[in-house]
């Protein structure tokens, strides 16, 4: 969503002047446009009610502050993820006003909050207004509204100051946060942030925060997640900080870093036969912290080997490669995504008329076949490159069929679903 919207907002500057279109008579708006305005109003009303109920006089969220991947600081801000996007789409000023004060309160609340049993958040879950050190699955979730805010108020001085600082954590501009190895072009740990990379084994407390009486599962799910050394494709989510810093300031160093880091990942994927590796060792080799296994790694291809979930290889890759393509127009940044999708379909299974793709890979090969075909990634690839070859598996996509004039009722049906979510 974020990459697609930014393409729409920014790509026009790179195009030749379009033909003049004269609009000189009023027409009735289509039904979907009226429904969209009503939907934005309903969201605004719901947001105001939610703010009144769950934000206190300090602009703190009414909750028990916890650290970790179960219910950490990111989950608080996920509640407000779309508010800055809704404003950018034409929503009420109240979205922006509420977000601003909630964000400021959030930064104070979780800078004050402590997780004493952790290695990196014992003196504050946030440090310098940023997560002390955690994975980009969660850091990225907590920053979505912040990143979309660039579309709302690009000249906001405090935003510019923060986005420069946050991007600098990944460019070694802060000596206390040596997250990036510029020689090997890696982020040095799955846990990284304003206090730098965690290079020692991650404990269940580093992952799950303080123990909660009667809830042992809070830590059980992380008992096999100690090895976080080296780079992981989730870290490509950090490209969004460099992207926002570059498009708002024009400073070349941010663009250079993003393209260097995303380019290194592109080259690794292509050298690995088009499969996205889920660990790059501290020596720069594929699978270097997992015995040379490209599919090793926490939140990687072989994580939790008895199931089909919690393999987050695609999330950062989709973001980082998409932003690199947006900045350059170089299709080589899209090719790793294309190749990965092709590799999955090459080993597909079919059951009861359904296509199943592998979600996991281990010593035994591909496994964990499910119906997840990564249509959202395939849709991005097609919309970025507009190559009909990328429509091979997307024939039934409702949005693309609408754009092709074959699914006129889609917008109303989609918004009906949104109205139900609000209710």
Where are the regions that the model predicts?
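Bacterial N-terminal signal peptides
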Residues: 4-13
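Glycan-recognition and catalytic cores of secretory/periplasmic carbohydrate-active enzymes
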Residues: 16-423
């Amino acid at each position: 969503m974020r990459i697609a919207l930014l393409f729409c907002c920014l790509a026009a500057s790179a195009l030749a002047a379009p033909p003049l279109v004269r609009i000189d008579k009023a027409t009735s708006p289509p039904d979907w446009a009226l429904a969209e305005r009503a939907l934005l109003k309903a969201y605004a009303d719901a947001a105001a009610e939610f703010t009144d109920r769950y934000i206190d006089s300090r602009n703190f969220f009414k909750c028990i502050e916890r650290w970790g991947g179960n219910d950490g600081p990111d989950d608080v801000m996920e509640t407000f993820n779309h508010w800055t996007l809704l404003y950018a789409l034409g929503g009420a000023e109240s979205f922006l006003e509420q977000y601003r004060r909630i964000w400021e309160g959030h930064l104070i609340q979780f800078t004050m909050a402590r997780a004493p049993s952790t290695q990196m958040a014992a003196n504050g879950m946030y440090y310098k207004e940023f997560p002390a050190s955690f994975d980009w699955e969660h850091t990225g979730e907590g920053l979505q509204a912040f990143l979309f805010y660039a579309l709302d108020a690009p000249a906001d001085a405090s935003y510019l100051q923060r986005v420069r600082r946050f991007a600098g954590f990944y460019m070694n501009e802060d000596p206390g946060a040596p997250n990036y190895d510029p020689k090997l072009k890696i982020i040095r740990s799955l846990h990284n942030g304003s206090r730098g990379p965690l290079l020692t084994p991650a404990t269940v407390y580093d992952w799950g925060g303080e123990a909660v009486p009667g809830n042992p599962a809070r830590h059980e799910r992380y008992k096999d997640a100690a090895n976080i050394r080296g780079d992981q494709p989730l870290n490509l989510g950090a490209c969004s900080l460099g992207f926002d810093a570059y498009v708002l300031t024009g400073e070349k160093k941010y663009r250079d870093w993003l393209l260097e880091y995303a380019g290194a990942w592109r080259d690794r994927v292509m050298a690995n036969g088009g499969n996205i590796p889920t660990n790059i060792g501290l020596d720069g080799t594929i699978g270097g912290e997992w015995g040379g296994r490209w599919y090793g790694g926490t939140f990687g291809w072989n994580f939790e080997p008895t199931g089909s979930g919690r393999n987050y290889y695609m999330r950062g890759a989709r973001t980082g490669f998409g932003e690199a393509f947006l900045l350059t127009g170089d299709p080589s940044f899209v090719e790793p995504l294309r190749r990965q999708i092709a590799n999955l379909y090459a080993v597909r299974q079919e059951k009861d008329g359904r296509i199943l793709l592998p979600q996991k890979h281990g010593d035994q090969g591909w496994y964990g076949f499910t119906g997840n075909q990564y249509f959202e990634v395939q849709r991005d690839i097609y919309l970025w490159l507009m190559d009909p070859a990328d429509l091979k598996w997307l024939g039934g996509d409702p949005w693309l069929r609408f754009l092709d004039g074959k699914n006129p009722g889609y917008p109303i049906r989609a918004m009906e679903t949104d109205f139900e979510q609000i209710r």
